[in-house]
Swiss-Prot record:
Domain of life the protein comes from: Eukaryota
This protein's UniProt keywords: Signal
One Pfam assignment: C6
Organism: Caenorhabditis elegans
SMART domains: C6
Stored PANTHER family: C6 DOMAIN-CONTAINING PROTEIN
Signal sequence extent: 1-18
UniProt name for this protein: Uncharacterized protein R07B1.5
Amino acid sequence: MELLSLAILSSFFAVANQCAATSPVTSPTTTTTEASVTTTIATSTSTTTVTTTTTVVTAACATCTTAQIGIITGNDGDMTPTSAITTDASGCSVITYTCERTPNVETDIVLITFYSDSQTPTDVGTENGVGTANVVMNCVNGEWVKDGIVINDVECQIIT
């Protein structure tokens, strides 16, 4: 009798294993890799590939150049200023024009006048100093701006 019970039990396990091997999968399995996600449900498989594209966009506030500012000369005391473009904490360009005689004479009265083609009159401001004068402009939407006004030209004058 024990042998018969063992044979029936063995037969039951064989049938159960065959059913388990052919039954559909009821819960999906997901495998994730670096570049793709594969999801297997029952007997169908769908694969989604994820592509990461890095595009470097130069902000309009970082596109200004020194060529956008004209230097006015021809008046008494006019000299060519020096300029330096730097980058602020936001990644935007900043330009500083410096006007001084070389070698520097600490008693010179120095003026930097800045001009805008969009204003009347076009001279929209002056920075002055003794020995040295500076004007700082920010690049905004691809244009140099001082106090909210687009600047097109600068003039450096030294009065002795």
